């Protein structure tokens, strides 16, 4: 079951929250359709901004939209001109007052949706699919991910018969509900047809209440230091001392440290 279902829906209420937060009775179907139109318009017109997720909140006639983007400057524009244009277009689309909250994704290398979109853009630019997957895999692991799984499906490399290929590194426990697994999907439009890209990223186990989970998420983002990278100890080394040189060199260094230095007499004394 965990292998087939969407990881976000499978863990809804356990480690993930709803991306749309409002309540309605008679207007439920109308508001759901309105949310779909908002998301489609944003994904179509702000594709270059690298949208990770869109969250929508409603209060009476006011709609609050949270945009998580890898490049928020594209959404904001010069002196906020682009953000005002987007807000105006959405108000025309919905006929309601719109409030935009634009947030930056601190570590795009460990965001599954952005990783999938990056691979798809490389495939559309005729980059070899294996090279694109390996590069994304290494970047995610170097940025602090505990495990990653990437799968590409379609006419890979322009082959006549479609197939699926994937790479995996680390742990990706899809059946564990407490596991914080991010999932993303994007389609690459190539001359041979569309290629689907799926990405699963494991960031660790999550426990406690929603408030505690939010605090843990903020702590992980602060520990990654923005965009992550290979600073500090390399992955897999931890705090272990450098073992290069072998046991003999270590024993010789220890013996020389324990041997007292010879005392020399002053010739002029």
Swiss-Prot record:
Q: Where is this region: Disordered?
A: 215-269
Keywords from UniProt, A to Z, are: Ribonucleoprotein, Ribosomal protein, RNA-binding, rRNA-binding
| Keyword Ribosomal protein on entry | yes
Compositional bias, Polar residues, is annotated for: 256-269
Show the GO cellular component annotation of the record: cytosolic small ribosomal subunit
Report any one BP term from Gene Ontology: translation
The KH type-2 domain extends over 38-106
Q: Which CDD domains match?
A: KH-II_30S_S3 (cd02412)
Q: Which GO terms describe its molecular function?
A: mRNA binding; rRNA binding; structural constituent of ribosome
Q: Which SMART domains match?
A: KH
Q: Which InterPro entries match?
A: KH_dom, KH_dom-like_a/b, KH_dom_type_2, KH_sf_prok-type, Ribosomal_S3_C_sf, Ribosomal_uS3_bac-typ, Ribosomal_uS3_C, Ribosomal_uS3_CS
Basic and acidic residues biased stretches = 236-252
Q: Which domain of life is it from?
A: Bacteria
Instruction: Fetch the PROSITE patterns from UniProt.
Output: KH_TYPE_2, RIBOSOMAL_S3
> Is ATP-binding set as a keyword in this record?
no
The record's subunit annotation is: Part of the 30S ribosomal subunit. Forms a tight complex with proteins S10 and S14.
Family, according to the entry, reads as follows:
Belongs to the universal ribosomal protein uS3 family.
Q: Which NCBIfam families match?
A: rpsC_bact
The UniProt function text for this chain reads:
Binds the lower part of the 30S subunit head. Binds mRNA in the 70S ribosome, positioning it for translation.
Stored PANTHER family: 30S/40S RIBOSOMAL PROTEIN S3, SMALL RIBOSOMAL SUBUNIT PROTEIN US3C
Instruction: Output this protein's name.
Output: Small ribosomal subunit protein uS3
Q: Which organism is it from?
A: Cutibacterium acnes (strain DSM 16379 / KPA171202)
């Amino acid at each position: 079951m965990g292998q087939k279902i969407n990881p976000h829906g499978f863990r809804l209420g356990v480690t993930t929250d709803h991306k749309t937060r409002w309540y309605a009775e008679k207007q439920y179907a109308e508001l759901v359709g309105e949310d779909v139109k908002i998301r489609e318009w944003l994904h179509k017109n702000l594709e270059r901004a690298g949208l990770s997720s869109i969250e929508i909140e409603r209060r009476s006639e006011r709609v609050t939209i949270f945009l998580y983007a890898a490049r928020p400057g594209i959404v904001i524009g010069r002196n906020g001109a682009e953000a005002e244009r987007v807000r105006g277009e959405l108000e025309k689309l919905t006929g309601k007052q719109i409030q935009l909250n634009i947030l930056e994704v601190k570590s795009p290398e460990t965001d599954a949706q952005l990783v999938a979109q990056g691979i798809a853009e490389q495939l559309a630019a005729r980059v070899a699919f294996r090279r694109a997957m390996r590069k994304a895999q290494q970047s995610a692991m170097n940025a602090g991910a505990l495990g990653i799984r990437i799968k590409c499906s379609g006419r890979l490399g322009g082959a006549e018969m479609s197939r699926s290929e994937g790479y995996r590194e680390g742990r990706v426990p899809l059946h564990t509900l407490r596991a914080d697994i991010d999932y993303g999907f994007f389609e690459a439009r190539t001359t041979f047809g569309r290629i689907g890209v799926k990405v699963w990223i494991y960031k660790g186990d999550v426990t406690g209440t929603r408030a505690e989970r939010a605090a843990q998420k903020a702590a992980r983002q602060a520990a990654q230091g923005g965009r992550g990278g290979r600073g500090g100890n390399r992955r897999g080394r931890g705090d272990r001392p450098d073992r290069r040189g072998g046991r003999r060199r270590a024993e010789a260094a220890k013996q020389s440290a324990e041997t007292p230095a010879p005392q020399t007499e002053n010739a002029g004394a």
